[in-house]
Amino acid sequence: MFIVEWSRTRVVFGAGTLERLGTELDTLGLARCLLVTTPRRDATIASVLAGLGDRLAGVCDIAAMHVPSDRVQRALAEVDRVRPDALLAAGGGSAIGLAKAIARERPLPIVAVPTTYAGSEMTSIWGITSGDTKTTGRNPAVAPRLVIYDPVLTLSLPAHTSAASGMNAMAHAVEAMYAPDASPMAAAVAEDAIRTLARALPSVAVTPRDLDARTLALRGAHAAAMALELAPMGLHHKLCHVLGGFGLPHAETHAALLPHVVAFNAPAAPEAMARIAGALGTNDAASGLRALNDILGLTMSLGTLGLKQADVERAASAVGAATFPNPRAATADAVRQLLVDAL
């Protein structure tokens, strides 16, 4: 048995599509948008502001990694002050994540203009961090109403960020391949995403200004995010969310952990692993992911990302006590060993 629930998100994909922002907003009847982004201002934000024109109600540029709860409260205060009719999130997962946290509390539609491959724009998944605990969940109300994918906006994304963000997307697709009770559609979309990203990301690493390669990578990220929305999250995402509470960088944590989690789950999901390996163009899924990390220059471990040996026990206990679908039982002891191997 499987159950599919899909959000009502309009997607506009293609080079130069940011120029359609005003038209798309008018079509949806949105006239006062609060721009949600990070403190960093660049050419992308300037282009978004130009596209908004007199539809700009205000700017909330306080988004930060893992969506800290204090930033959410500040953003809610800004919403109450400005009273927009929509949230326009421009940037990566931090900006879109903050918009989702706002939308949980205030019934506002989200327009997303992603500039990375993180994928939050296509899901109903939200996350908020308080102290060293990151809480996540699903809520249809936070799924963006409109997503504009313009590959031109990714041309200036630094090489390391592109690689790590791309492997973040890869993790979405890989975990959807073996998720218990996921629909056949999820696996089909995920397999296409893996194949597309495996082809695109090395090209982006070599020629980061190649618009064709960037377009392919963004298409793969879009498909990976769709797969994530169609499938339950398992051990990999649970681990990444728990480690996010310790302040580890989100995308890099995905990249460092993914081969280890895939190797752990492999005995319990041989058919899915064979399909993953085939999509990667290798004979073994975990080895193929390690090789791709190497090609992309992502050779870091959890230790180099900031995880301390003293934190391993706390993280293992938190994951081991949680309930989530996974092909193989993830006890605290098993998770502890996995984290030690990934240090």
What residue ranges belong to the model's regions?
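ATP/NTP phosphate-donor binding region
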Residues: M1-D85, L302
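Short glycine/serine/threonine-rich phosphate/pyrophosphate-binding segments
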Residues: L18-L21, R41-I45, S69-D70, S94-A101, ...
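A glycine/threonine-rich phosphate-anchoring loop and its flanking beta-alpha core
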Residues: T23, R104-A188, A193, A272-R275
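Acidic, glycine-rich active-site loops and adjacent beta-strand->loop/helix elements
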Residues: H66, G92-S94, I102, T115-G119, ...
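A short, small-residue-rich loop immediately preceding and capping a beta-strand
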Residues: V79-I102, R106-Y117, L239
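Active-site segments that bind and position negatively charged phosphate/pyrophosphate groups
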Residues: P180-G288
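C-terminal charged capping/lid subdomain of soluble metabolic enzymes
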Residues: A279-L343
